[in-house]
Amino acid sequence: MLKKNCLPLVIGLLLGVAAPLAATAKDYLRTCWHQQGQSLQASCLTLNYRETVNELEHNAAPWQTTAYTGRGTVWTNAESFGKQDTLRAAARPRTYFSSTQWSPATLLFRDYGDQGLFAATPGLQQDYTFRAARYSPVALLAYFVQHRVPADKTALPGLVAYHATINETVVSLFIRRHDALLDHVTLLSPDELLGDVSTTFTYQNYAEAAGVRYPATIRIAKANGQVQDEVSIEAATSQPAAPMLLAPPPGYQLRPAAATQPEIRVERFRPHLHFIELEHTNDRVLVVEFDQFLVVAEAPLNSANGELILREARKIAPSKPIRYFVAGHHHPHYLGGLRPFVHQGATILYGAGSGPYVAYLAAAPHTLRPDSLQRDPKPWRGEEIRDTKTIADGTFTMQIFCIGAQSGHTNDYLVYYFPSEKLLFEDDLVGIPRQGPPGKASARQAGLYQAIKARGLAVDIVVQSWPVTEAGVKTIIPFVELEQSMK
């Protein structure tokens, strides 16, 4: 049994041991860096990889991806990242090449299919600190160590978290407690269409080369988990220095980011039909004026453009509410600006099968770049058009037809017909050149012609939404020229 006068000594000894332990709590970030990159001070880690890439492109259905396979080599350390690679589309027999050379002060980038360097901005250069983590987290770990990012005390079980904001992206590292290796990285970035978008790089199957631990498998979940990619490291070595992949041109500097200046032209095309042309996006928006209300068709890319269109529509008819907003199909040039119309209480019209995607866009958080719907949330109202919808007020009629896959473009494709004008408005199906006779109709062009004929529509003129001026094609098209292209 301990004597009473020994108790203070025992308690003091216990406290004396406990205090140093608390003061020297493990620094998981530095321990991780020590294993995964610190030894690369005078050398670089060289990684040969292959990857599967799935991209959201202009496909037939929402969330449908285009599949690519890639191979390449990465050279990386704390102060540099280089990549030379090829990308091949699974459905097309063509190989694309790209090169990237990054440092904390520079970015040289030749994009797939380009001959010259991409004009990189300071924001894009900053973003490569975390973009490179798709292949290797070395540069990103170095950034967190150099900036002495503190640990988050509310980490998930078994993990220690660290958070930093780089440019506009919230970057989070999650390090495993049991071995102090990086488990995964999450990115939360603003996207003009999808809102707050998360991307996760999950690191698996750690191996070692030249004393550096690296993940041999990286699984990528992007677009809020809607799209999955994978990178597999096939070989890893260390070498004294990375090769010079790209040479900076004379006077090289990052291009300052320039704000887009919206240029708008409004035209009263017919008594009930108005066009709003957005020159900065090369789009034509249709405003249909009824006796008591308006219908707006198409809003390109983002909420900012949607707000511009709302403003111009109010100028056309200040006392008339916008009852409907309709997008010809689900691609960003037509649906991207829908959220301001949701905020204004318009009913959103969409083609067959696109309802869940439209609902997703309407409900998507936009906290990183708030728009009107984020600041003042409103419920959305929608209506699917599977066949035909007629909008009329007794004096003027608009018919909306879902031609879907017949368009040769998307499964939800809508066209707008005005019987009294013998006019049909569509998004992007016709490619008749401005100069010279019409060539042979493309699949899209033929699909539109056949859809018009199958429905018995009397059409004199076809008006196209995009492109208004680029690509050298007509966008106000006599129907006889569409007929000629079918011969």
Regions found by a protein language model. Name each.
Residues 267-313, 413-432:
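Conserved beta-strand hairpin/beta-sheet module of binuclear metal-dependent hydrolase folds
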Residues 304-349, 455-459:
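Active-site metal-binding motif and surrounding structural segment of the metallo-beta-lactamase
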Residues 228-291:
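Zn-dependent metallo-beta-lactamase
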Residues 102-171, 177-179, 189-195, 248-255, ...:
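Flexible, processing/modification-adjacent segments and terminal tails
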Residues 156-247, 414-419, 426-427, 432, ...:
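Gly/Pro-enriched, hydrophobic low-complexity segments
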